[in-house]
Structure formats: C-alpha cells, structure tokens
Amino acid sequence: MSKKYELYEVKDGKIVRKNPECVRCSHGIFMADHGDRYACGRCGYTQWKNE
C-alpha cells in the first residue's frame, strides 16, 4: 500500500515535498532518498546529492 502522505510536510501553512520528483517520469513519481543520492524506482534514474 502506498504511503505518499509520508513524502509531504506542512511548513508555514503550505504543503512541501520532502523528496524530489523524477525528471524522466511523470509528475507524482518521487525519488527515494539513499543518503548520498536520490534514485527513481520506476526508471532507474539516479541524481547525486551535492556536498
């Protein structure tokens, strides 16, 4: 079962995404946080975090 509610938080009365969305896939596909990188489970795209 999906837990998309865990990917959002409320700051100053506005909804903010915790993880980025995949640039290759459509909207609503979030990337997983793996510490030093973000990875898409759907297409495999990896985005490295900057230090």
Swiss-Prot record:
Record key words, sorted: Metal-binding, Ribonucleoprotein, Ribosomal protein, Zinc, Zinc-finger
UniProt-listed InterPro entries: Ribosomal_eS31 (IPR002906), Ribosomal_eS31_arc (IPR022845), Ribosomal_zn-bd (IPR011332)
Positions of C4-type zinc fingers: 22-43
Binding-site positions, Zn(2+): C22, C25, C40, C43
Signal peptide: none
SUPFAM superfamilies reported in the protein's UniProt record: Zn-binding ribosomal proteins
Cofactor note: Binds 1 zinc ion per subunit.
SMART domains, A to Z: Ribosomal_S27
MF term (GO), any: zinc ion binding
Gene Ontology CC: one annotated term: ribonucleoprotein complex
Cofactors required: Zn(2+)
GO terms of biological process kind: translation
Subunit-structure text: Part of the 30S ribosomal subunit.
HAMAP family: Ribosomal_eS31 (MF_00777)
Family: Belongs to the eukaryotic ribosomal protein eS31 family.
Protein name: Small ribosomal subunit protein eS31
